[in-house]
């Protein structure tokens, strides 16, 4: 076993900023985005459309898609400073905020970004366990009949997913994850397509389109308001990748300029995503109407063909193995970079231990990476076991993440990047855009908190 200090760079090619030569392309960027976006959020969209109805549901998805595109375009120009093509690179979202905005805003951004990505980890643990349990229930219903009491717990599957993530978390960084993102993207296309196809087939079988313009009927107006608010939060959760856009852009090679490649990748990925979202959400609602389950593939609106339900849920599990890493790796990188700066001479922080095992690739283990990442995974798994509420957790995370990280900080950084003066036309348009999104976030936040508290106390 050999010891290699991370301060001593192994032989290879490096950019002028000390990082390895970037090899990312338009297609790898699209793969990273799709891995981040088409996740557990797609499974709740049929329920969201059911709460909003046939007009407000699809319109809401289009609006969130357009907002995501605008935000990603603004943020892609802030990757370099001062010039968006030739300026110094930023490796993390928080680095960009630190350059463009005040120190206080940097701390707020860093806290919200880490909280958001940590929350996505919790949501992915919940979703994976539900999908694993759904496979077991699907087989039970097939053997015992649809009325059989096929009841199983989530805890074992959460612990199993946590164990898998402890191993996957030892992947050093984003640049070593391209294969995992490509695999995860294939899986996301697979289960989104299956959800769409099953919904479409059920609509054909029903010979009618269920649902209404006003959505699911509730006993009181207050209940309707809470459900609509939570549905908006769930849709906001389904478009979350602005929080890791800078990290994805930092993998791209240049030329062509990274901001141009990222804009093309964002537009392509959002178009693909929105198509699948509309298909899954609308056909799911058309198939089940007011009885639309909270999770389209695990709520057991579909029982047969059971093997296809099993395959779709297996695809969800494989996708979320990669999705968890897409949102966790930036947190790992920030913490480990901070430790390396604070204690540059610590062997625990900076030394890597090379282990050679016959017939296997060389393993490089860093003790800080091993300890911190393991504790991180254990904590997300523990909180998921404490709050295993799918729709409520997704809505809360979407509401918390949407305005500050997707709208406010990109808009404020763009003002500095483009030197936009207050009360000019562009300033008024973007500030109005930001204020409207703030109102939507507050509405979604209130509804999601109410739903989470109600579920916990019920």
Where in this protein do the model-derived segments appear?
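Membrane-interface "cap" regions at the ends of multi-pass membrane proteins
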Residues: 1-44, 68-73
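The first (N-terminal) embedded transmembrane alpha-helix
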Residues: 2, 26-43, 160-164, 234-244, ...
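Membrane-interfacial loop- and helix-cap regions that link adjacent transmembrane helices
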Residues: 3-4, 8-10, 21-22, 27, ...
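Alpha-helical transmembrane segments of multi-pass membrane proteins, especially transporters
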Residues: 32, 60-65, 265, 269
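Central hydrophobic cores of alpha-helical transmembrane segments in multi-pass inner-membrane proteins
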Residues: 40, 65-77, 161-170, 407-410
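Short, hydrophobic transmembrane alpha-helix segments
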Residues: 45-53, 174-175, 391-392
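Hydrophobic alpha-helical transmembrane segments
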Residues: 48, 167-171, 383-388
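Extracellular loop-to-transmembrane helix junctions
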Residues: 48-81, 86-87
């Amino acid at each position: 076993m050999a010891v290699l200090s991370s301060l001593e760079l192994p032989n290879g090619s490096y950019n002028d900023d000390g990082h390895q030569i970037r090899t990312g392309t338009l297609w790898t960027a699209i793969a990273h985005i799709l891995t981040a976006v088409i996740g557990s959020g797609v499974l709740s969209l049929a329920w969201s459309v059911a709460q909003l109805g046939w007009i407000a549901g699809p319109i809401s998805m289009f609006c969130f898609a357009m907002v995501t595109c605008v935000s990603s375009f603004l943020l892609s120009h802030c990757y370099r400073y001062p010039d968006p093509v030739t300026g110094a690179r930023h490796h993390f979202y928080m680095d960009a905020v630190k350059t463009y905005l005040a120190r206080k805003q940097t701390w707020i951004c860093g806290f919200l970004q880490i909280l958001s990505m940590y929350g996505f980890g919790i949501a992915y643990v919940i979703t994976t366990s539900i999908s694993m349990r759904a496979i077991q229930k699907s087989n039970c219903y097939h053997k015992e009949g649809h009325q059989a009491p096929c009841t199983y717990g989530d805890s074992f599957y959460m612990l199993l997913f946590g164990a898998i993530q402890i191993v996957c978390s030892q992947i050093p960084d984003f640049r070593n994850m391209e294969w995992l993102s490509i695999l995860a993207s294939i899986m996301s296309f697979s289960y989104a397509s299956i959800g769409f196809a099953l919904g479409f087939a059920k609509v054909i079988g029903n010979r009618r389109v269920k649902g209404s313009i006003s959505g699911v009927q509730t006993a009181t107006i207050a209940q309707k308001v809470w459900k609509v608010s939570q549905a908006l939060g769930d849709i906001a959760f389904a478009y979350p990748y602005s929080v890791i856009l800078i990290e994805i852009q930092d993998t791209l090679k240049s030329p062509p300029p990274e901001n141009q490649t990222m804009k093309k990748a964002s537009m392509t990925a959002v178009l693909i995503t929105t198509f699948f979202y509309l298909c899954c959400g609308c056909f799911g609602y058309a198939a089940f109407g007011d009885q639309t389950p909270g999770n389209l593939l695990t709520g057991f609106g579909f029982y047969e063909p059971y093997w296809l339900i099993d395959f779709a849920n297996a695809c969800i599990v494989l996708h979320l193995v990669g999705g968890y890493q897409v949102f966790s790796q930036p947190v790992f990188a920030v913490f480990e970079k901070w430790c390396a700066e604070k204690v540059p001479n610590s062997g625990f922080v900076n030394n890597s231990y090379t282990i050679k095992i016959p017939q296997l690739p060389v393993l490089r283990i860093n003790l800080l990476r091993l300890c911190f990442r393991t504790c991180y995974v254990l904590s997300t798994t523990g909180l998921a076991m404490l709050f295993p509420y799918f729709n409520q957790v997704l809505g809360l995370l979407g509401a918390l993440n949407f305005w500050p990280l997707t709208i406010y900080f990109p808009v404020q950084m763009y003002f500095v990047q483009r030197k936009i003066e207050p009360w000019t036309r562009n300033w008024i348009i973007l500030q109005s855009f930001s204020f409207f999104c703030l109102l939507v976030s507050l509405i979604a936040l209130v509804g999601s908190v109410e739903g989470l508290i109600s579920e916990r106390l019920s």
